[in-house]
Curated annotation (Swiss-Prot):
Disulfide bonds: none annotated. This is UPF0696 protein C11orf68 homolog. Belongs to the UPF0696 family. Residues 1-60 are annotated as: Disordered. It comes from the Eukaryota. Gene3D superfamilies: RNA Cap, Translation Initiation Factor Eif4e. Residues 11-20 have a biased composition (Gly residues). Residues 35-44 have a biased composition (Basic and acidic residues). It comes from Rattus norvegicus (Rat). Residues 1-10 have a biased composition (Low complexity).
Length: 292
């Protein structure tokens, strides 16, 4: 497994290689008995159908505004549990110390962090960052916009393939509180145990609003891999609506309410109680076709 963009890694496959969470920002905090700085980066966060700003606000903001806030979050320090360098036995203590509903985006004397935190993330043992040729992708995107040629989902897919920017992520949106913290703990454990490879969650915004958990896969064109990640997420106890977004949209700053009227999410997954064995129904949104 390998590959991806500002993302995480091959979810559900248990192999090495993987997306590059937000293209590995410049600073992060990793748990190795105590916090320490470590270079790395991931990706912005998302709303019910696309991405919200990491600040937590969802409505009335342009795609440009959301992209700017996402970039700011990527550049701030992250809280990271890295299973490649930290014993799995320390995970529970880390989760208890940094529940996402209490970690604040800009720091607060009463929260676990006194300084800004862009994201909280978990890296699996097989995680190897690989974001592809993001600079080449962005240059090709600029050229496409000035060429006057149509900009369609197919165009973006081909750009992503050409520049090997193939990662994507399942998005889980929850209000701050017990359900969010419980869901994040389940996802983080799945990462550390090797059932998923990389995930991150946004900190709590001053304005409130939902927070987002992003669970990454290596290749958005690999439908089987995307569905395997959905199954692993459901097995971790997640029952809410999931949506899936390729990182090419994030790298190019394409969020909801964008000027091209593109929908950045490819799939949605709905939990099915007592339904099929995999526990969810996944819809291909572009073609309105059920995949499971």
């Amino acid at each position: 497994m390998a590959a991806a963009a500002a993302a995480v890694a091959g979810a559900g496959r248990g192999g090495g290689g993987g997306a590059d969470p937000g293209q590995e920002r410049s600073r992060a905090r990793s748990w190795v008995g105590a916090e320490r700085s470590e270079g790395r980066r991931m990706e912005p966060n998302e709303e019910l159908e696309e991405e919200d700003s990491p600040g937590g606000r969802e409505d009335g903001f342009t795609a440009e505004h959301l992209a700017a806030e996402a970039m700011a979050a990527d550049m701030d320090p992250w809280l990271v549990f890295d299973a490649r360098t930290t014993p799995a036995t320390e995970l529970d203590a880390w989760l208890a110390k940094y529940p996402p509903s209490q970690v604040t985006r800009y720091g607060d004397p009463g929260s676990p962090n006194s300084e800004p935190v862009g994201w909280i993330a978990a890296y699996g043992q097989g995680y190897t960052p690989n974001s592809g040729d993001v600079q080449g992708l962005q240059a090709a995107w600029e050229a496409l916009q000035t060429s006057g040629r149509p900009i369609t989902p197919g165009t973006l897919r081909q750009l992503a393939i050409t520049h090997h920017v193939l990662s994507g992520k399942w998005l889980i949106h929850l209000a701050p509180g017990f359900k969010l913290d419980h869901a994040w703990a389940g996802i983080a454990r799945a990462v550390v145990e090797g059932r998923l490879q990389v995930a991150k969650v946004s900190p709590r915004a001053k304005e409130g609003g939902r927070q987002v958990i992003c669970v990454y896969t290596d290749d958005f064109t690999d439908r089987l891999g995307v569905l395997e990640a959905d199954s692993a997420i459901r097995a971790a106890g997640i029952k809410c609506l999931l949506t899936y977004k390729p990182d090419v949209y994030t790298y190019l700053g394409i969020y909801r309410a964008n000027r091209w009227h593109l929908c950045p999410t490819l799939y949605e997954s709905r939990f099915q109680l007592g339904g099929n064995a995999r526990g969810s129904r996944v819809l291909d949104r572009a073609n309105n076709v059920e995949l499971t």
